[in-house]
């Protein structure tokens, strides 16, 4: 006989709790409302989210879309039972990819999949997503919560995010005038951000430390909490600098692959980025990871951001104006190098100096 007796099986008997899903929707409505912006005034719960480009102030917009996830950083959140900030990471990984193309993030949608839905856990996650949307100035207009028993182990979940932004036609980055001698600026990261966490977890395993242990690199913080420091969202400072100075030629979001994989993505084939590694101020978390795991500098640079989360390319005469605009918005700016000529088939990122780890 089924758990529901003579009435037969229910969806709940199969492991899907519709009531829990409805409760989650009620819990997250205030957070979702807090992300409203011009162009997005609808309520969640419809079949699709709406956005009015004209109301957002665009005349001849080009839409830019990005999607991403948080990777195995989620495993630390699950094991440490700390879910409040991974939603910020989810938004950051998408909207930072939009702003590097000169686009203003407009709206965001999320996908949250789990084996068994915990409404409180889900509300914490979506609360983080809403916080990230507020930081980026985009609206959370919809999402999908999938309870899938048998697909995920107990307590496990995964996240995916989808962001759409816009820029006026002719204002997209990178510009077509990047030249030899242009200066490369770096914006400080907030920590490991959301890449390289499979290696992070392996190093922590080697260290023998638990997630509740004091973080060796962050006084007064637990290891898990410190490693879960959310990814910095660079959107508003960069958009302001773009609009105020008109001098930003290219931006590169330093994610998986580090400097050597990400910087060349925005450069013409005849130019390379010459980075002075001595100028990189490596935060303590990366020094600890390198020492504890015996990770060589080259591997650190192709796995982690090593303290620089965003690259900005400007003409030499505009360095002061762009730096001042970004610093006024709270960014830490460092001059990292310059553009040099690149031979055919040569690397798009070259180094001088030594990384101090």
UniProtKB/Swiss-Prot annotation:
Swiss-Prot/TrEMBL catalytic activity = 2-formamido-N(1)-(5-O-phospho-beta-D-ribosyl)acetamidine + ATP = 5-amino-1-(5-phospho-beta-D-ribosyl)imidazole + ADP + phosphate + H(+)
Question: A Gene Ontology MF term for this entry?
Answer: ATP binding
Per the record, the coiled-coil ranges are: none
Enumerate the Gene Ontology biological process terms: 'de novo' IMP biosynthetic process; adenine biosynthetic process
Report keywords, A-Z.
ATP-binding, Cytoplasm, Ligase, Nucleotide-binding, Purine biosynthesis
Q: Does the keyword Repeat apply?
A: no
Write down any Gene Ontology CC term.
cytosol
One of this protein's Pfam families, by short name? AIRS_C
Subcellular location, principal: cytoplasm
InterPro entries of this UniProt entry? PurM-like_C_dom, PurM-like_C_sf, PurM-like_N, PurM-like_N_sf, PurM_cligase
Question: What compartments host this protein?
Answer: Cytoplasm
Task: Name the pathway.
Answer: Purine metabolism; IMP biosynthesis via de novo pathway; 5-amino-1-(5-phospho-D-ribosyl)imidazole from N(2)-formyl-N(1)-(5-phospho-D-ribosyl)glycinamide: step 2/2
Q: What Enzyme Commission number(s) does the record list for this chain?
A: 6.3.3.1
**Which Gene3D superfamilies does the UniProt record give?**
PurM-like C-terminal domain, PurM-like, N-terminal domain
The record's listing under PANTHER family reads: TRIFUNCTIONAL PURINE BIOSYNTHETIC PROTEIN ADENOSINE-3, TRIFUNCTIONAL PURINE BIOSYNTHETIC PROTEIN ADENOSINE-3-RELATED
- Which family is it part of? Belongs to the AIR synthase family.
The molecule here is called Phosphoribosylformylglycinamidine cyclo-ligase
Organism from which the protein derives: Rhizobium etli (strain CIAT 652)
């Amino acid at each position: 006989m089924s758990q529901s007796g003579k009435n037969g099986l229910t969806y709940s008997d199969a492991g899907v709790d519709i009531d829990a899903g409805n409760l989650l929707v009620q819990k997250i409505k205030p957070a979702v409302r807090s992300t409203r912006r011009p162009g997005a005034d609808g309520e969640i719960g419809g079949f699709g989210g709406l956005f009015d480009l004209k109301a957002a102030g665009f005349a001849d917009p080009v839409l830019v879309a990005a999607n991403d996830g948080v990777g195995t950083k989620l495993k630390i959140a699950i094991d440490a039972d700390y879910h409040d900030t991974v939603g910020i990471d989810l938004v950051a990984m998408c909207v930072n990819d939009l702003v590097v193309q000169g686009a203003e993030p407009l709206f965001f949608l999320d996908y949250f999949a789990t084996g068994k839905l915990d409404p409180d856990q889900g509300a914490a996650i979506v609360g983080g997503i809403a916080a990230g949307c507020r930081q980026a100035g985009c609206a959370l207009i919809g999402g999908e919560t999938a309870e899938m028993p048998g697909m995920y182990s107990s307590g496990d979940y995964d996240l995916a995010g989808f962001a759409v932004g816009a820029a006026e036609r002719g204002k997209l980055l990178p510009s077509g005038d990047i030249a030899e001698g242009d200066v490369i600026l770096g914006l400080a990261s907030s920590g490991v951000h959301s890449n390289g966490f499979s290696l992070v977890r392996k190093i922590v395993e080697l260290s023998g430390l638990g997630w509740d242990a004091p973080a060796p690199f962050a006084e007064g913080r637990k290891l898990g909490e410190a490693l879960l420091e959310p990814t910095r969202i660079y959107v508003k400072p960069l958009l302001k600098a773009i609009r105020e100075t008109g001098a930003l030629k290219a931006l590169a979001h330093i994610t998986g692959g580090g400097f050597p994989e990400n910087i060349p993505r925005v450069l013409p084939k005849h130019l390379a980025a010459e980075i002075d590694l001595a100028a990189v101020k490596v935060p303590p978390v990366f020094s600890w990871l390198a020492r504890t795991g015996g990770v060589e500098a080259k591997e650190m640079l192709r796995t982690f951001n090593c303290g620089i989360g965003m690259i900005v390319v400007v003409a030499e005469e505009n360095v002061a104006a762009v730096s001042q605009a970004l610093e006024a918005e709270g960014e830490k700016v460092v001059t990292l190098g310059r553009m040099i000529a690149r031979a055919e088939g040569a690397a798009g990122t070259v180094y001088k100096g030594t990384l101090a780890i």
